[in-house]
Amino acid sequence: MSAPRLEIDLEAIADNTRTLVSQLDPLGIGVTGITKASLGSPGVAAAMLKGGATGLGDSRVENLARLRAGGVTTTTTTLIRSPMVSQAALVVRDADISLNTEAAVIDSLAAAALSQGTTHGVVVMVELGDLREGVPVADVVDVCRHVVKTPGVVLTGLGTNLACQSGVAPDQLKMDELSQLVEKVETSCDRGLSIVSGGNSANLDWALSTADAGHINDLRLGEAILLGTEPLHRRVLDGLRTDAFTLFAEVIEVKTKPALPWGDTAQAAFGTPPARHDGELVRQAIVALGRQDTDPHGLAPPSGIITLGMSSDHLVLDVGDHDVSVGDELSFSLGYGALLRAATSPFVTKLEVDSA
């Protein structure tokens, strides 16, 4: 088989979705499955829907278009990054809903929707402290009123995002504040909100321990479904599988070399050279895998093998006395950043399998 290769176990993704849906359902919280770390794979999307996700979301409109082209047409799709004005027509065509913070963008979406003879759903995002996207709390009602009075768009809900930019953790106080804003908006705009999206996989620590979810009825889950982990502490969540993704790469050199480089040293290809530990000799393997293919942070080699460094196209490993030869394939588990880059690299073959 071709390498490097990302193997995707679709049943593991369905299992994780099913587990999270069953855990969140008693709280009245549905799951929007986020496909961006799979490059909008229709197969991954179908697995999420099989597991009970109530909708799908992605940060790139191109990925949402890929879902539709791949036959995923029977569920609500949400663009989870604030739309670009230049893509307003594409957003209206390929997404049912988008997360928004700017009146100018909302107006562009409205104009595009009217020209296409349709309407587009708007979820207004609220800034609750992580300092990425979001309308200041004091301005939320005014922005929502603007949506309500603008033909072509429909005020669908409120949402927030935490833990992505500044690491601010979702907690009961943050979620209560969002719920209180929902009541304020519903009263001021004289209409109910169908979606109150409390955040992403980082919300699961809160959601699975809270006694009161308030008005929160949606979470946008990617990492937890795909990797079985939560982003705050990279902890494996109870009942979730961590074997949905495996990256395979081929060994192209195995040689015993000195433990330390020699000669005058300066910057390496990506800045400061990686530290090398003193010693006499290292049995070193090079794998045909580089930063063009994945992120070295979050890339875990087989047990007992040590990563020495990675450049654009080469991964250097200390394989010790492991039985490793040229032409062999080694398997790697992935953290979120490593998965995201591997899934989006054109040099990594994707192979979806169904273990059911």
Feature map (PLM): residue ranges:
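N-terminal capping/small domains of soluble enzymes
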Residues: 16-17, 26, 37-49, 63, ...
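Generic N-terminal amphipathic, Lys/Arg-enriched alpha-helix
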Residues: 1-8, 12
